[in-house]
């Protein structure tokens, strides 16, 4: 396996960044920013092309140093329409980079153009990592969302479900990197283009002209920049359109799924109303351990929790005082765990070095009692649920939605006495195991779980997982949890506290012994899972348009909910999802449709 930390970039004597793989420069030695503005921004008729559009999507082949995106953001912030009572314009950016560079390398490259100012700063402050897959990047203050695909161009285009209004075709020279300019790639670009989309590139190579023409673009040569005599502009058939999109969303459920949904909806300009009847949400513990479900086999089932984990960690780190602790150890419990941990540590789905196998001596020193080998997850977090929910939920309407009715494109939320609670364009069911009231045939199974905690401080700073888990709270420690299928009781049970203590003794007997006389508090809640142990995030099958579900998160709600909520917000607004297609297929509620008799009521 190649070294994932090896830089694909070298610096020439004149200070220009050059690809170590292809031998080509990242941008023009004459003036890279001027070239970007002439070739890509003007070549795609920006800013005129986004005038009058609520949402505008730009795709790019070859993220490189981020110069094109920084220049685009600078132009967007200066030229987008101001906010109005109907909201404001939103920009979505999708770029592909098979060989990403580091934030420090990008900062050195972009420092040549201080005029990019805040646009370059926000990009560098949220610079994506090196893990393979899709990265959702926040660009605060720019009304923009950025998804970067760290993978080869062909699978990246196949995985993206968006349709770009403009394309920056900026790979290295066709002579040095011909694979990126193949006819199949340009056909895939066309397939991911909106009607009337424009594409621009610096090259006029015959293979590129023919490939764009064969894909259906009208191709024209234009005067080039600097020493290049010509460049290309291309226009896809059709006329650009701005279809009407939902404005008002109701979120039913006030736990982490609902809170994440409200945050994601508002980030995309939706007005989100939250309804919660306060019936023991599953997100009410004093601490939540945020770790991904691990799959040593790789593939989509491993990639989904890995991508969700990275996104969740970034969002929680941005919340003031939400993080209680960082890092966690997953102990080897059975002999096969050592091989599984080694396989996970070798996966490129996580940032390099963030999953590492520790020998028994090192793990023992970390935890203060004898343990075997362990997997160190340095980006794991312990968060305080109340701070996350308070930051994301917004105003909560204390009411039980007893029934939903759909008429003339409007969803009506009705209370227990059939009183009208709200009229909205779309509804998300995010009530966990309580979905059955509004979706009787939901493919969700209830699992009761009880956690236990004490005000005695945890002797070591590192959370640990061992079948059960233990994590610090603000003023003590939490451990657990029980898993009882088809039990919907939310009463705290002394026997379950004892079960949790016995499970703790199997993983960390010294710690468990120290708690033998400690007063324990327990809290029980009912979580929802599915037959295949994967969540559901999408349209409710069999229901009228505009009804969606986010659920089946099991015990991984704080890991999965933030990214899946962004995926669902994209589905609601017909925008590009942050999930690659193979991952979004895993969470489609319709995968159970053969067993679903009716939609929601």
Swiss-Prot record:
Main location as per UniProt: cytoplasm
Sequence segments annotated as region (tRNA (mnm(5)s(2)U34)-methyltransferase): 1-237
Cofactor: FAD
Any one GO MF annotation of this record: flavin adenine dinucleotide binding
Chemical reaction(s) catalysed: 5-aminomethyl-2-thiouridine(34) in tRNA + S-adenosyl-L-methionine = 5-methylaminomethyl-2-thiouridine(34) in tRNA + S-adenosyl-L-homocysteine + H(+)
Domain of life according to the entry: Bacteria
Compartmental location: Cytoplasm
EC number, UniProt record: 2.1.1.61, 1.5.-.-
Renumbered residue ranges of the record's region FAD-dependent cmnm(5)s(2)U34 oxidoreductase: 252-601
GO biological process, alphabetically ordered: methylation; tRNA wobble base modification
Keywords in alphabetical order: Cytoplasm, FAD, Flavoprotein, Methyltransferase, Multifunctional enzyme, Oxidoreductase, S-adenosyl-L-methionine, Transferase, tRNA processing
GO cellular component: cytoplasm
Described purpose of this protein according to its UniProt entry: Catalyzes the last two steps in the biosynthesis of 5-methylaminomethyl-2-thiouridine (mnm(5)s(2)U) at the wobble position (U34) in tRNA. Catalyzes the FAD-dependent demodification of cmnm(5)s(2)U34 to nm(5)s(2)U34, followed by the transfer of a methyl group from S-adenosyl-L-methionine to nm(5)s(2)U34, to form mnm(5)s(2)U34.
Membership in a protein family: In the N-terminal section; belongs to the methyltransferase superfamily. tRNA (mnm(5)s(2)U34)-methyltransferase family. In the C-terminal section; belongs to the DAO family.
Protein name: tRNA 5-methylaminomethyl-2-thiouridine biosynthesis bifunctional protein MnmC
Organism: Caulobacter sp. (strain K31)
